[in-house]
Swiss-Prot record:
Name recorded for this polypeptide: S-adenosylmethionine:tRNA ribosyltransferase-isomerase
Coiled coil (UniProt feature): none
Family per record: Belongs to the QueA family.
Keyword Cytoplasm: yes
Enzyme Commission number, as recorded: 2.4.99.17
UniProt xrefs under SUPFAM superfamilies: QueA-like
Location relative to the cell: Cytoplasm
Stated role: Transfers and isomerizes the ribose moiety from AdoMet to the 7-aminomethyl group of 7-deazaguanine (preQ1-tRNA) to give epoxyqueuosine (oQ-tRNA).
Enzyme class per UniProt: transferase
GO MF terms held by the record: S-adenosylmethionine:tRNA ribosyltransferase-isomerase activity
One Gene Ontology biological process: tRNA wobble guanine modification
UniProt xrefs under Pfam families: Queuosine_synth (PF02547)
Length: 349
């Protein structure tokens, strides 16, 4: 499969800059793989497609305020630091991306906060934009994290071209988020409100929560036409025994199994055994799913409308079928569905 097969023209006005007023009131396009039928619904109508014993698998990773702005020592030049992950708690070492990269070198000190209350030293270059920073902070680890996060802001995707607003802290986070570590929100889950979750529970649907810490690799441009040559960034994930039991029981009893988002789909396809059952997994995945691909666990999927040429669109097309999904995207453009993390949703049955 070639990269260019996933190109389409997305007008900028269809990229959602803000979420729907209520989480579960975004639009929902329902795509039926067996008949090719496409329905236009509201997200809360997802209730109509699931019942007793059906399983929803969610990603409970939690986004942290990863984007910091600071100044370089001596010159005072403004810099952006994007926190990726903590490497060493005791030494306050973090893996980060910096911008402008060419001006940030080993040995430089970076200052954050109005009174330069937080200082970091560049101790290593990891990639062209990647650096290892050591934060110089005297308090304990909890105090350090609190101070660091107070300086950070919600890491909205770059395609949301506006300033971060107070509501983003809440809305760019799933209501069931629990395990901190993501710099990208699993967007399919953003449509699930507390009320909708309650109503699914009343219908006796089952919930399973795995963890995959979504990273910036989701937005990295693919620079090869032949998709077999693309390498995904690795992401940390955990599928525990509870998830395995709930999913395999539902599957064995013939119930629907819904993967809520591409991150969930990547995780369960990483943790699947040869007989199509889920198994426990703790580690890293760099699984890249593109057409054609045979899925083993999920029978349905919720996902957002993705950017052209993105790996997320490729996975969606793998599950829904390339022709059907690209046709559905044509319809979405004509019907002015909203794209991106704050946009509308698609349910593939």
């Amino acid at each position: 499969m070639k990269l260019s097969k996933f190109k389409f023209n997305l007008p900028s006005e269809l990229i959602a800059l803000h979420p729907a007023k209520n989480r579960d009131e975004s639009r929902l396009m329902v795509v039926h793989r067996d008949t090719g039928e496409i329905e236009h619904r509201e997200f809360k109508d997802i209730l109509d497609y699931y019942g007793k014993g059906d399983v929803f698998i969610f990603n409970n990773t939690k986004v942290f305020p990863a984007r910091l702005y600071g100044n370089k020592e001596k010159t005072g030049a403004r810099i952006e630091v994007f926190l990726l992950r903590e490497l060493n708690e005791d030494l306050r070492l973090w893996d980060v991306l910096v911008d402008p990269a060419r001006k940030i070198r080993i040995g430089n000190k970076l200052y954050f906060g109005e009174d330069d209350s937080m200082v970091a030293e560049v101790i290593d270059n990891t990639t062209s934009r990647g650096r290892t920073l050591r934060f110089l902070y005297d308090g304990n680890h909890d105090e350090f994290k609190k101070a660091l996060y107070a300086l950070g802001e919600t890491p909205l995707p770059k395609y949301i071209e506006r300033e971060v607003e107070p509501e983003d802290e809440d809305r760019y986070q799933n209501i069931f988020a629990a395990e901190e570590g993501a710099v990208v929100a699993p967007a399919a889950g953003l449509h699930f409100s507390r009320e909708l979750m309650k109503r699914l529970e009343i219908k006796d649907c089952q919930f399973a929560f795995l963890t995959l810490h979504s990273g910036l690799g989701n937005f990295r441009e693919i620079d090869v036409e032949d998709l077999t040559k693309h390498k995904m960034d690795s992401e940390q994930m955990v599928v525990n025994a509870d998830v395995v039991d709930i999913v395999n029981k539902g599957k064995d009893e013939g119930h629907k199994v819904c993967a809520v988002g591409t991150s969930v789909m990547r995780a369960i396809e990483t943790a699947v055994s040869t007989d199509g059952h889920l198994k426990e997994f703790e580690g890293w995945t760099n699984k890249f799913i593109f057409p054609p691909y045979d899925f083993s666990v999920a029978t349905s999927m919720v996902t957002n409308f993705h950017m052209p040429l993105s790996t997320l669109l490729m996975m969606t097309a793998s599950f829904g079928g390339y022709e059907l999904i690209m046709d559905a995207y044509d319809i979405a453009l004509k019907e002015k569905y909203r794209f991106g993390a704050y946009g509308d949703a698609m349910l593939i049955l």
